[in-house]
Design a protein with these regions (language model features):
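N-terminal active-site beta-alpha-beta segment that forms phosphate/nucleotide-binding
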Residues: 2-6, 10-112, 116-127
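Conserved phosphate- and dinucleotide-binding cores of soluble alpha/beta proteins
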Residues: 2-6, 96-212
Length: 212
């Protein structure tokens, strides 16, 4: 793995390594069968809804899985949150801006939006409360809480505006890597949810201290 600052072209070498890792992880994820993704996602959702960050949250910020891309499906967790009386919201993108829209039921509440992702059709914008939990998708994660996104920076920009809100990365087993080669602007995850459980990461900052 290239070392930052080890040579004049270290930046370009590292950029290429990140591009290669993103491509490899996306291809590996896309190779999973729909049944395999569904089975692993169901397990992940059970761990999410049993976790302390979820139980203490009043608002759950979810995401709609990319169809056919092998992305972990958190809709079962969103459905459970609604049954428990929690508020839920899903992202909607306009230009470079992402916001979360409240959803009161999962049927007929979405339409295809930016990047062919299903987006909510409602109009009520929700912002993270002090007790909110944001479920964060990604291409790859590492055990230190590092996250590699899709390259657009939408989540990093959004999460940077709410530094005290708990973030839980959601990953299939094939998305866990040794090192995502995080950049200074990449927002780390305080928790990771996988089919092995929900774990607190090694993130060392104020928002990592779960006082609830």
């Amino acid at each position: 793995m290239p070392v930052k600052g080890s040579s004049n072209n270290s930046g370009s070498v590292e950029d290429k390594a990140r591009r290669d890792l993103r491509c490899a992880c996306k291809n590996a994820r896309a190779s999973l069968t729909a049944d395999a993704v569904m089975e692993e996602s169901a397990c992940i959702c059970r761990y999410i809804t049993a976790s302390a960050p979820y139980r203490s949250a009043d608002r759950i910020f979810c995401y709609y899985p990319l169809e056919g891309a092998g992305e972990a499906d958190v809709l079962p967790a969103a459905k459970q949150a609604l049954l428990e009386g929690k508020q839920i919201a899903f992202p909607r993108v306009t230009g470079d801006h992402m916001e979360f829209i409240r959803v009161d039921e999962l049927q007929d509440s979405f339409r295809e939006g930016s990047f062919h992702v299903m987006e909510p059709v409602g109009s009520e914008v929700l912002t993270p409360s002090a007790q909110a939990l944001i479920l964060v998708p990604g291409v790859a994660f590492d055990s230190a809480g590092g996250r590699m996104g899709y390259g657009g920076g939408y989540y990093d920009r959004y999460l940077s505006a709410y530094p005290e809100t708990l973030c839980m990365g959601v990953a299939l087993h094939i998305q866990m890597v040794t090192d995502v080669m995080a950049q200074p602007w990449d927002i780390p995850m305080q928790y990771l949810a996988t089919a092995q459980g929900v774990v607190h990461t090694a993130v060392k900052n104020d928002i990592c201290n779960d006082k609830r």
